[in-house]
Swiss-Prot record:
Domain of life, source organism: Bacteria
Post-translational modification: May be beta-lysylated on the epsilon-amino group of Lys-34 by the combined action of EpmA and EpmB, and then hydroxylated on the C5 position of the same residue by EpmC (if this protein is present). Lysylation is critical for the stimulatory effect of EF-P on peptide-bond formation. The lysylation moiety may extend toward the peptidyltransferase center and stabilize the terminal 3-CCA end of the tRNA. Hydroxylation of the C5 position on Lys-34 may allow additional potential stabilizing hydrogen-bond interactions with the P-tRNA.
Pathway: Protein biosynthesis; polypeptide chain elongation
GO biological process: peptide biosynthetic process
Taxonomy of the source species: Bacteria, Pseudomonadati, Pseudomonadota, Gammaproteobacteria, Alteromonadales
Name this protein carries in UniProt: Elongation factor P
Originating gene: efp
Keywords, sorted A to Z: Cytoplasm, Elongation factor, Hydroxylation, Protein biosynthesis
Modified-residue entries (N6-(3,6-diaminohexanoyl)-5-hydroxylysine), positions: 34
Chain segments annotated as coiled-coil in the UniProt record: none
Keyword Protein biosynthesis assigned: yes
């Protein structure tokens, strides 16, 4: 696999660190008044999901991670595995609970997700940035109840709970940002 110099570091670059594939989240080049320049890098370990901060000397090289990212459609969950399908080859890839992680609450059948494969096994599932889900449970919004403008909690069809504005009702479909878990808008049908 290719090696990357610290000058090539950027967000999203996949590197090997401590024998585990990692993704660079943030890279900051630091030039102190005295001494050698260095890079302060935040990396997310793709298997464990932990975010750690590492320091690399300027010019140091790091091994690139041999990972593959595929765009696959989510099919179904059989209780143990979440099954995804390649729309071109129709090959199915099962992912376990560890790979799916927090993405479970945003998975909707037929949505295209990004799977990260390492040594042929899925290690990370990333749902689409925005999903449209139906509200299955929420408190009724009472007229004039605007003392706390934070909205109200709503349970979605996947089991996820998000804060929504008071005017949103049960049965409505809303658009949610999966990166932050926040309500974006109502969806008109």
């Amino acid at each position: 696999m290719a090696n990357y110099s610290t000058s090539e570091f950027k967000g999203g670059l996949k590197i090997m660190q401590d024998g585990e594939p990692c993704s660079i989240v943030e890279n900051e080049m630091v030039k102190p008044g005295k001494g050698q320049a260095f890079n302060r890098v935040k990396i997310r370990k793709l298997i464990s999901g932990k975010v750690v901060e590492k320091t690399f000397k300027s010019g140091e090289s790091v091994e690139g991670a041999d990972v593959i990212e595929l765009e696959l459609s989510y099919l179904y969950n059989d209780g143990e595995f979440w099954h995804f399908m390649n729309n071109e080859t129709f090959e199915q890839v099962p992912a376990d609970e560890k790979a799916v992680g927090e993405a479970e609450k945003w998975l909707v059948e037929q949505d295209v997700c990004t799977l990260t494969l390492w040594e042929g096994k899925p290690i990370n599932v990333q749902p689409p940035n925005f999903v449209e889900l139906e509200i299955t449970e929420t408190d009724p919004g009472l007229k004039g109840d605007t003392a706390g403008t934070g909205g109200k909690p709503a349970t979605l069809s996947t089991g996820a709970v998000v804060r929504v504005p008071l005017f949103v009702q049960i049965g409505e479909v809303i658009k949610v940002d999966t990166r932050s878990g926040e309500y974006v808008s109502r969806v008109q049908k």
